[in-house]
Regions:
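FIC/Doc superfamily catalytic core
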Residues: 1-201
Length: 201
């Protein structure tokens, strides 16, 4: 703000500005892991293995993602999730339309597929009924658009000094925090971590 002579140095825009406690040890470790992966993938001796490892990782991520939701995916759901993961290679910037497309891919039930971000309140609950069963109440629908605009601006920004693994975690967690759809948010959040890493190279 020029009026107040304050330099905003937050992670992300005002609409979505998470706070992260930085640790030199954690940052160092994250960079080491990324460097080792990059070195391995760039080695010509591993050229034939890269595709095999990616295919294994995609299949493993698909099954694990459904296991987190306590589901065993039917073959059509497995194929849909794999297709969504393969779309991440396109490195498209996040937008509401793109997220709706991804949600429609991972949610195979036409009744639960979305056309836009939610316009009603949702919540997560464990077994039981009533308010005591609610374990998370996402932001109200009136705030979803602004929060998602901020989150998408953070996700799409290619510059900045946020380490890639930290940014991927922020995008993934932020998506679950906002919970912009009535269904599929958990699966999409796991896809968005990978999307964030692919955008950052």
């Amino acid at each position: 703000s020029q009026k107040l002579r304050i330099n905003f140095n937050g992670i992300g825009p005002y609409e979505f500005c998470p706070v992260v406690r930085r640790s030199p040890a954690l940052e160092r470790r994250g960079l080491e892991v990324l460097e080792r992966l990059h070195t391995w993938a760039a080695d010509p001796a591993n050229a034939g293995l890269v595709d095999r490892v990616l295919n294994w990782a995609y299949l493993s991520e698909t099954r694990d993602s459904y296991a987190i939701e306590n589901e065993t995916p039917a073959p059509d759901k497995e194929r849909a999730f794999l297709q969504a993961m393969e779309q991440l290679r396109d490195r498209r910037p996040l937008s509401e339309d793109y997220l709706v497309d991804l949600q429609n891919l991972v949610i195979t039930s036409a009744i639960k597929q979305e056309l836009a971000f939610r316009h009603e309140q949702n919540w997560l609950q464990r077994g039981g009924h009533g308010a005591l069963a609610v374990r998370y109440l996402p932001p109200p629908p009136a705030q979803v658009g602004e929060l998602m605009d901020g989150l998408m601006r953070l996700a799409n920004a290619r510059e900045g000094d946020v380490p890639p693994l930290v940014k991927a975690a922020l995008v993934s967690f932020g998506f679950v925090f906002v919970h912009p759809f009535m269904d599929g948010n958990g699966r999409l959040s796991r896809l968005l971590a990978q999307h964030s890493l692919s955008l950052q190279g």
